[in-house]
């Protein structure tokens, strides 16, 4: 019996729930990266381990590896630099701005699907080349950090000075299932029939939040859109994909021209000679894929992309040759040995070295996407400036490379290591350092009283604190309450925030802040960021106490206020939520329902299913819908922290029906009399409809459930309020996320 015909009568095999009900709301993404999958001790502190590393020795070992060519995978030109640059680039290059997912921060290139994407062919060999070094230094260096550092050392070993490097990327131990890579069922060179609404390569719009033109690519098709060798059309795709990775035109040109100053592509023959990708390969392959039967299968016979291009005559040294050749030659379309579209310089001498035969030379060659830098007017202007100003080119590439490889690391408070650059960059979302004594317990108590006596309904303080803190994204560690950017553009103008409660609560808090800070002789101050969180905590505490539950909501000062000048408006605009089910906000869904967006948001906030459930129920009880609506506010006591949401949702005396064909809004009526009782959204009703969520709701809706609910809500609230406090040691927030 062939392997594909093997029986599946084993644990976890057979037909699964998702096969029967493919549209079922899945909560698996809320159960990832926990201690159940992590082999390291619970108290393992990766940042501390990294700081104990002999960093210089590690870099020397990496530098030695660059020219230590192995027979089983020989180095092009005797140097692995190009391979390791590509590995680092592709590790970081999956990042996208709309949801903060992807990127290098978790070492996900080791796992499916990334380890088997067509665009990552042969990077399995790069990681195996690194294994002896990883084995030597053990847990002091994560795979996530090592892959990026190897790229930096590769640049250094070829004469380029990087901008810097930070460690701190803790490994995960399973494939991240939270990332939407696209709806396609095929990979590149197909694999784009869902992400684009039409086939017109000159007008099509890429689906959000994607940042690649095909399933299985990091960026775009190097042969041109859908294989069409049109540099101008390629420029359009490049601008979209690089833009969605947070790169502007200058950074894009710098990265392409700088990255292609090194190494080569591999297309000795057709990919038909290659075996299956790592995830489909046999056990004997030991995690390696694409094993080729063409010639030696490696070296001069290597097959990766199917393109066969060496860009410069100095592929192991930094130079401006790429830009020089780009503009010096006229280019004509040709084919690689594998039949792929590429370009060769007309009437040019053979000046490009062969990767393995020193007696051979080749004519300069380029990819369609390379020529986009010449034939797109905006890119051309930048590329010519870089050619005429090599120092500007080097600086731009160094900065863009640092941004590429560190974009998903979050604030500088997470940076560790001896090569962290001192310059503060706008894309790091800088926040001023604390420069004054912090408030103590007595101050906090008096400030709480001032907040509660301000005359502002406490639900508005809850809404404001949630609006500020819930911008956090676990993928790229951006957002959160620190910085008080809720008061700045663009956050204050987002539809979900541009409501009367924000203006009223901020005005009251600014008045309290001014009074407190102006009255002190001991230099103590409280930031608006701290005060926003404290107001939310005071409101929750008061709402619980008035409902009969004596609780203390934790609060730790130390946040500071960012300025508008320290806030990149365009960058933050990508973080505007499409939906926030926690406060019953949703724009028109596309191919997903509101409850799916809720789970998406919960995963960004690193919440578990019980935490998500407690927060939704509590925020409804506290009357914190973004627009003040009564949807899901299943209580006669709005503003009190009770379990009424769950009690009334689970009440069999209520029947529900949609208000229209969209199925977005529902009315609940008394089963006996038919009189209207409640209104609800899909997000509200899913806690009674979805079997797993209902099971949690039943715990909180039971006669003995309210005290536990209040306790769990306060814990989850505290977690969200502190998700961005990387300056604190937190036990209640998973450090490995």
Curated annotation (Swiss-Prot):
Its EC number is 1.11.1.21
Source organism per UniProt: Aspergillus terreus (strain NIH 2624 / FGSC A1156)
Question: Where found?
Answer: Cytoplasm
Q: What is this protein called?
A: Catalase-peroxidase
Q: What class of enzyme is it?
A: oxidoreductase
* PTM comment text: Formation of the three residue Trp-Tyr-Met cross-link is important for the catalase, but not the peroxidase activity of the enzyme.
Q: Which InterPro entries match?
A: Catalase_peroxidase, Haem_peroxidase, Haem_peroxidase_sf, Peroxidases_AS, Peroxidases_heam-ligand_BS
The UniProt catalytic activity note for this protein reads: H2O2 + AH2 = A + 2 H2O; 2 H2O2 = O2 + 2 H2O
